[in-house]
Amino acid sequence: MNTRIELITPIITEGVRSLAEVQPFERADLTVTHSLIVQGPASIESEFDEALSVPDTVRKAIDAERRGANAIIIDCMGDPGLHACREVVTIPVLGPCQTALHTAGTLGHAFAFVTVLDRLRSMLAKLVASYGLSDNYACFRAVDIPVLDISHNLTSLNAALAREAIAAVKQDHADVIVLGCTGFLGCAGAIRQGLLAQGLDVPVIDPIPLAIHVADALVKTGLSHSKLTYPPPRRKAVAGYRFPEFADGGKA
């Protein structure tokens, strides 16, 4: 069975995500396509940014299923609009954060987030709690690099990420590292080498590749989200949004 996964980047900034970055994970039976929202924030670094990103992310999810996607991944560690998207489509929708955190629980007892900015600390702690994993949360560490600056100096970025990962293991007793921004795609190898150089054999989870393979597994095993948990929205009056499918009488 061929799987087509739609990667939805929930920001409006072009060039942040390239299909070339995910092509190494494609196979003859697995294709990844990509879309960017057109209404929302330039980046997601706060609850406010996340709220702005959700409506068009949901719209893109509906459109992706109509175009034949078999699964959807929301390309942000805040998992914006995850539950709403699951309500409006029938195919699997994965949040890279939820996927990474539950996988971390199978690889160790205490995970650490290594992410972009310290201001995300409470936002990610709330997300961890919502996924029922607070007892497994070792620590939060940030490299103080805004999302849109990630690609400016990858050598410096990798060094900073490795430094924080080592500190998370040595000082906070983390035994799994979770990259806390999907913009860090491709950095896991360098961080792992930095850990090994310190004698620390600790797994480093790169959320997007993991989500791609989990989504593919769900599709190939015929699994998707329970509609008892994620029932379709009831039709009602809707103003200011492009959701005729769920507006009263089918009209926005």
Regions found by a protein language model. Give the residues of each.
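Short, acidic/small-residue loops that bind anionic groups at enzyme active sites
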Residues: 86-107, 191-212
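Periplasmic-binding protein-like
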Residues: 66-76, 173-182
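Conserved beta-strand elements of the Class I
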Residues: 6, 111-114, 175
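Extended, histidine- and acidic-residue-enriched regions that form the cofactor-binding/catalytic faces
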Residues: 9-10, 166-199, 214-218, 229, ...
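Glycine-rich, highly charged phosphate/nucleotide-binding loops
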Residues: 46-63, 156-164
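N-terminal glycine-rich anion-binding loop in soluble enzyme alpha/beta folds
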Residues: 1-55, 116-154, 247-248
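Short, glycine-/small-residue-rich phosphate/pyrophosphate-handling segment
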Residues: 105-143, 152-156, 216-252
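Active-site rim beta-loop-alpha module in soluble metabolic enzymes
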Residues: 128-182, 187-192
